[in-house]
């Protein structure tokens, strides 16, 4: 188990190739990627911070709805062949035997998926004012941050020019998840009833934004 007082921190502005601290920051990215294997991106722009605030507001509006609310039920993924939409509490797979995931989620993918490949299902959006627009805007912003991060990793490990970016540019398998971990009664909290158990993701990288520690 990795124990850190705080994660390595990378200045997002210094990942721009014309920044004064670019070479030094690339070495910091390499070191963090090797050990512990993750890092925290700092110094996001005011525009990105504003988009995050709007996203948080939309998430609060959606996840505050009851599980029997028509807005949620209309896009419920339970017993559906479409994984895009609202996943109710305890539907998340148990990634470790004997655990129960204490969360609900809203999942969606890129529009081009269902247009270019019929095997992909279309997105389903909750009927909440500006929800779709605000959430898509934050995903576009995070996509730009992701590509910048891929460029940094590419440079750090001396891959062929834009190798990582070129292998991630279609985003066919890219998915954004809005996750809600409701506060649990202290009597229910134990090693088996977890927010989400330890697991690995299948993407090249995963960007995580949290509203609280944990």
Regions found by a protein language model. Give the residues of each.
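Peripheral, non-catalytic segments flanking oxidoreductase cores
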Residues: 1-214
